[in-house]
Amino acid sequence: MNKFMDWMECEEKYIRKVQIDKNKIKSIIKAAEKRQIIIDKIGIDKETVSFVVENYYEIIKELLVALLLSNGIKSSNHQCLISYFYKNYPELESYAHLISEMSFLRNRLNYYGELIDYSFYDKNKDKIIKIILKFKENIKKLLI
């Protein structure tokens, strides 16, 4: 399985405290929801799956940013977003591993042109949706 960035290193180098800005958090959530609309419009097949997975990763990343902001912190490193989730939600470790794998696949797509196999999406689609719903639920609890 994937190794996560050390949280202590994240705190030292990439994490800073910020004011909780509910409007900014809501705006980030809205951007993530618009990405979902795009996914729904283009549909998912063998031709589009790489870009669908990429967009799902971006949705998850945006929701992680919102989750951190809801807790009064901000990260300048995407891997620290995953590390934060792994540290604070140990019961959802398998989700953290999937997010890390999606990050890896997204980077391979963006920097090397390696397409994502449909089987990855097919195997993980339910978990991806559960991750998104769980993040939204946790953020809403923090904003109340």
Where are these regions (language model features)?
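Terminal alpha-helical segments
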Residues: M1-I144
